[in-house]
Structures are given as C-alpha cells and as structure tokens.
C-alpha cells in the first residue's frame, strides 16, 4: 500500500514537472524576440499617439538599440552572479528613463501628454521614488 502511494506521488510529481516544462517551453517559443517586441511597441505607440512615419522610425530605432543594451547589462549582472534584485531594477530604470527622455524629444507636446496619461507618468514617478529612496538610503 505504501509503495502504491509513493508510486502515485512520484508519478504525480513527474507529471507536474513535465507539464511545467512543456508550458515553459511553449511560452518561450511563443514569446517574440527583443527586436519583435521593439517593433510591436513602436506599432502600439503609432496607433495610440498617431505618430508620423519619421517618429515611428525614431521610436523603433531607439527601442531596437536600448532594449538589447538593457538586456546586455542584465546578462553582465547574471554572469557576475549578482542576486540583488535592486541592481537589476536600477538597470531597468536607467534604460527606461533614457527611452522616455528620447520619446520626449521625438513626440509633440500633445503626444507626450497622451503618452504620460497612458501610464508612463505613473511609471516615471515609481522610478523617481525608487531613485530617491536609494539615494536617501546611501546617506544613512
């Protein structure tokens, strides 16, 4: 009886692991690469902000440069076996601040205001709050 219970538990665990791996692999295969993500974001911003073609080009170029650069910094942290999630967040914040600064130069005032209303203002405030907290923590 005990062996049947152990066997059932082992089979259930094995099934769960295989199902999880299958789901993870399917999600990995379905997820677009970084350049496709940049294109999708540029297309989304074109629809939402009614961007002109030259603006879409600059947004796309910015994202295709900055996304891989951010990922390269993540990879450096991973290779250095950095486990501090704050450091990863700092890298992300740095690159998103840079992207927003570029967007501000590309967008008209109306487009920028719409972009901020779409959630960017909240994200910027959160990044500024984290930065202030980190700087305040260094002074202690």
PLM features: residue spans?
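Bacterial Sec-dependent N-terminal signal peptides
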Residues: 1-31
């Amino acid at each position: 009886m005990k062996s049947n219970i152990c066997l059932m538990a082992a089979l259930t665990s094995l099934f769960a692991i295989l199902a999880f791996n299958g789901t993870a692999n399917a999600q990995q295969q379905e997820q677009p690469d970084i350049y496709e993500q940049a294109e999708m974001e540029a297309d989304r911003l074109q629809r939402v902000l009614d961007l002109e073609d030259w603006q879409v080009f600059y947004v796309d170029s910015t994202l295709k440069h900055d996304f891989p650069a951010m990922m390269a910094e993540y990879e450096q942290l991973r290779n250095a076996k950095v486990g501090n999630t704050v450091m990863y967040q700092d890298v992300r914040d740095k690159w998103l601040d840079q992207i927003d600064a570029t967007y501000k130069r590309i967008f008209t005032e109306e487009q920028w205001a719409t972009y901020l209303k779409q959630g960017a203002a909240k994200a910027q405030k959160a990044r500024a709050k984290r930065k202030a907290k980190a700087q305040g923590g260094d002074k202690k």
